[in-house]
Amino acid sequence: MATKSRLLFLQKYLFENTDDNHSISTNELIAVLEANGFKANRKTVKDDVEMLIDADYDILIEKDGKSNAYHYGSRTFQLPELKMLVDAVSSSRFISAEKSDALIQKLTSLASKYEAQELTAKVFTADRIKADNGKIFLITDIVSRAIEQCRKSP
């Protein structure tokens, strides 16, 4: 059981805290694991990372002197794509400020914490003209479904 939870923790930690520009060394990873209640050594880290790689997680290993450094590789969206989506959401007038903030929060969760800071550094939805209707997504969905129903009906 400890191995499974350590693997899940390791995958989540690498996803949230590493990217192409921010790696973590084996020793740093051991310290993080131990600080979170997991027993770890070089072999367990190596084995766990290999298991994640075998499970199709894109964990990249780089040589950092005599030690290894690890970081999460490809993600669902690349940083420029996330920037474009965040800009589109924040500048959209029909999305309320509250809904914009919630959507931007969801989009930033797809990036590392460093990339998330970059995404939110210039986003200010409060000063923009936004819709007051928080139910716009529900209304849009209902209209879309109605249009689709009309297309299916003879």
Where are these regions (language model features)?
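Short, basic/aromatic recognition patches that contact phosphate-bearing ligands
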Residues: 1-88
